[in-house]
Amino acid sequence: MDAPFESGDSSATVVAEAVNNQFGGLSLKESNTNAPVLPSQTTSNHRVQNLVWKPKSYGTVSGSSSATEVGKTSAVSQIGSSGDTKVGLNLSKIFGGNLLEKFSVDKSTYCHAQIRATFYPKFENEKTDQEIRTRMIEMVSKGLATLEVSLKHSGSLFMYAGHKGGAYAKNSFGNIYTAVGVFVLSRMFREAWGTKAPKKEAEFNDFLEKNRMCISMELVTAVLGDHGQRPLDDYVVVTAVTELGNGKPQFYSTSEIISFCRKWRLPTNHVWLFSTRKSVTSFFAAFDALCEEGIATSVCRALDEVADISVPASKDHVKVQGEILEGLVARIVSSQSSRDMENVLRDHPPPPCDGANLDLGLSLREICAAHRSNEKQQMRALLRSVGPSFCPSDVEWFGDESHPKSADKSVITKFLQSQPADYSTSKLQEMVRLMKEKRLPAAFKCYHNFHRAEDISPDNLFYKLVVHVHSDSGFRRYHKEMRHMPSLWPLYRGFFVDINLFKSNKGRDLMALKSIDNASENDGRGEKDGLADDDANLMIKMKFLTYKLRTFLIRNGLSILFKDGAAAYKTYYLRQMKIWGTSDGKQKELCKMLDEWAAYIRRKCGNDQLSSSTYLSEAEPFLEQYAKRSPKNHILIGSAGNLVRTEDFLAIVDGDLDEEGDLVKKQGVTPATPEPAVKEAVQKDEGLIVFFPGIPGSAKSALCKELLNAPGGFGDDRPVHTLMGDLVKGKYWPKVADERRKKPQSIMLADKNAPNEDVWRQIEDMCRRTRASAVPIVADSEGTDTNPYSLDALAVFMFRVLQRVNHPGKLDKESSNAGYVLLMFYHLYEGKNRNEFESELIERFGSLIKMPLLKSDRTPLPDPVKSVLEEGIDLFNLHSRRHGRLESTKGTYAAEWTKWEKQLRDTLVANSEYLSSIQVPFESMVHQVREELKTIAKGDYKPPSSEKRKHGSIVFAAINLPATQVHSLLEKLAAANPTMRSFLEGKKKSIQEKLERSHVTLAHKRSHGVATVASYSQHLNREVPVELTELIYNDKMAALTAHVGSVDGETVVSKNEWPHVTLWTAEGVTAKEANTLPQLYLEGKASRLVIDPPVSISGPLEFF
């Protein structure tokens, strides 16, 4: 969960057309004024290159050398010297005189920008999870890298850059999240340092300020809303240490983080390193064995056993958070990491905790409980309790309460127009400019920098910029741009920049320009620790089902359960389990539990939806009672019963809670219920709903008419009928549902665009209630990075609509706002690329038909057409941000819309020949769609294949033997031995069933432990020879004695006392009882047939 972005005017700004791309220069000269000073003509290359920050030694200010200075200090790199205090700060300069409005950009205007706080860049891996695993194993096996794994705590991102540098949440600052963060961080110092805490707090803040550093933490607390389990204590865990310097942020390695944290006595995470093929493959196998039932104790124990190095956390997850573990983060790091970690662990032992037994004052929960009236009261109380080192001023939270904290949006325009004062500024301008040009889903929010209030003058302005990326698609698209422009700085998560706009009369300095250009050569790092970029950024997040059932299945399903009912909720959680690839057994268990939960909470709450921020108040007692019923239930739930009551101290949070899911969507296994919404094949004895997730102009009505009149229908006797949306009065989909109930075995052509998930849920509900399948038909298109429909497709749709006459829905050439209407439909699909769009439809409905639209050999879209569409999209974004869904003929941009609608028509008419020529002929399209529908109607359709991986299915490791070879051995034994032939007679069918699953068990999770089963992963899928030497049997069971061979000279050892292949068990006898056959033989209760010579059979080592 992360802080919601602060509210404010979300209107977009029109970036100035002409942006100055040339560089200016700035040296950090000493000055008696607070204005930046431009370099002289004698500035050397060496001096400007020193603007690139160099790593510092970590440690306390009193115990280590001071920070390396970059040149001399100036107002550009200093916090204002006025000494902010909790009262009396003069903010009149900020709000007096409309300084920004009067600040004009000319040749003497410069900008200095520095990153003030940031977290790691977010790289969206384009590979599947399985491909990432394979690459990780390959790199570790070759000695090119080490795999690092850490615990994923359930909390909020919190960043701290010193008492003047500021405190930040993921996309905001100056709110309850950061107030709680500062309080908890200060309390960690008091707990660690005891009576020395005030002195160490001051030193720590001074150290961060002088070295321009930022530490990032996971803030885990019970006062900011529920995750998977309410933590037993409030704490932080340091996850990143960043040197911001005067250039590109430099992140510490994990060993450096641990060294830094142990010197300052800050909490560190539990970390494991895997540097061999055996250990890294064992890790992935251990996770697969635990992912459906793992809790903190079992996971940490298993990883401790298989890892090469284990570094325990400063705070035990079980003691401060609880047993419910969100997940693990695995990433590739340098092959030297193990050696570096060993050195750090040797030189920096865990520090003492001097304040453990001291009275630290009121706790976070006590303070929040005492100030429940409003959020500002809670923040003030928390900040007063922090002390002067961490909070010398509360200006960041309250500023001047008679004025807004946000600044005018023109800050960004002037930032981009100004000459960059140094190389770092030029790179930040490059980032923002590209994100705007590519229209990435991001907001650039500017705020007054209250810490610099005393330094402000008409020619010297200071602001804070928050770069808020709205969706993961923004990171994906930016990463794609980095492939074409390797010199781009990464797009960071938690991205805050200090901006200084100022005037200088020194003129331009050509030597400084050259110096800055040369500095850029030193910025490209090439490979990180010898790793190529793609490999250096390999990371995978792995979450546990015990956490997901609480957050994703219970909490995130509340709105569906209360709004749409139990049936829709069931569809939701089945789809989630399918996406995750949950094993069949767990699906059945979860269905039973979640159905019971849905009935329980609806009965208790009625129509009053349970709050997602306090859902555990109801869910935890329910889960506790459910777990007590059986051991199986207890394993499913993981842990329950230690509920922390939050109702009296929950912080007042303005806005919805946010959760980073980071789930990779895959086709899952067969759902656990007999009537799933998603079907592996469409059944021909059911009804059929054909619907269109499309845009006006896709020819769906014309297609429906042709399909309705097609001779012979769809090859069977089911009636076909259609319902045209433009002719239906009232709500359309309830009418379709009525028709389905009247004619449950009919084929319904739903002639209406179905553009969003709410409609898809209604269709799923119809399918479930009326025993029908649904088939989506979509116009084929390459799409864009964030939309399943390309601009080419959009152009054709608009062209078709503007050729219509007398359209029933009044959307034709006479419609004055037709272009706006199509843009509105187009944006309903925003946020999904083509692959994501199609995958979700297939996951929901089990089928998909692509309606041919554009010829593959067409020439590119003409520039005038592309340009007018892009202008329309920009205008739509401006309009929707300011006015929401208000008609285009109303509002601020009405005149611009009128002008654009005319320009659109003129442009499309001028390019009508091109737009007509690129379309697939209508008759060809109809024929292809009809044939695919016939296949579906017959029940012969199978959905497109996709990678399927069953997680959580590892229970034991075994060698899988070919059934034909074992069967051949039995035939030979029967032919040579009448007694054996007599024994086998009458058991052929049951033996054949066993032979289909014949295997030699090596280790079982319940009997031998997760780590033991996982240890076989280094030989996964390798052929292992097995020598069969004898057959032992009686009237209840029979099995072959097996001697397991070796792989690459290493003997594969079975942990079973008697390795064997079970051939047969009588009814009521479990396979496990076959383990007793050797003892029964010694007791004279079983017979033995020696196989001479022994028979050798090979099979792959697999997990089951």
UniProtKB/Swiss-Prot annotation:
Requires the presence of Mg(2+) to exhibit tRNA ligase activity. Changing S701A: Loss of tRNA ligase activity. One of its GO terms (cellular component) is cytoplasm. One of its GO terms (molecular function) is mRNA binding. Disruption phenotype: Abnormal auxin responses leading to altered root physiology (e.g. elongation, meristem morphology and gravitropism) and aberrations in cotyledon number and venation. At later developmental stages, reduced apical dominance and aberrations in lateral organ positioning at inflorescence stems. Changing K543A: Loss of tRNA ligase activity. Mainly expressed in proliferating cells and tissues such as root meristems, the vasculature of developing plantlets, flowers and elongating tissue. GO terms for biological process: auxin-activated signaling pathway; regulation of auxin mediated signaling pathway; RNA repair; translation; tRNA splicing, via endonucleolytic cleavage and ligation. Pfam families: tRNA_lig_CPD. The active site is at K152. It is an enzyme of class 6 (ligase). Changing T1001A: Loss of tRNA ligase activity due to impaired CPDase activity, but conserved kinase activity. Changing H999A: Reduced tRNA ligase activity due to reduced CPDase activity. It is found in: Nucleus; Cytoplasm. The keyword Thylakoid does not apply. Requires the presence of NTP, preferentially ATP rather than dATP, UTP, CTP and GTP, respectively, to mediate ribonucleotide 5'-phosphorylation. Its EC number is 6.5.1.3. Its main location: nucleus. It catalyses: ATP + (ribonucleotide)n-3'-hydroxyl + 5'-phospho-(ribonucleotide)m = (ribonucleotide)n+m + AMP + diphosphate. Belongs to the TRL1 family. Essential component of stress-response pathways entailing repair of RNA breaks with 2',3'-cyclic phosphate and 5'-OH ends. Tri-functional enzyme that repairs RNA breaks with 2',3'-cyclic-PO(4) and 5'-OH ends. The ligation activity requires three sequential enzymatic activities: opening of the 2'3'-cyclic phosphodiester bond of the 5' half-tRNA leaving a 2'-phosphomonoester (CPDase activity), phosphorylation of the 5' terminus of the 3' half-tRNA in the presence of ATP (kinase activity) and ligation of the two tRNA halves in an ATP-dependent reaction (ligase activity). This is tRNA ligase 1. It comes from Arabidopsis thaliana (Mouse-ear cress). The gene is RNL.
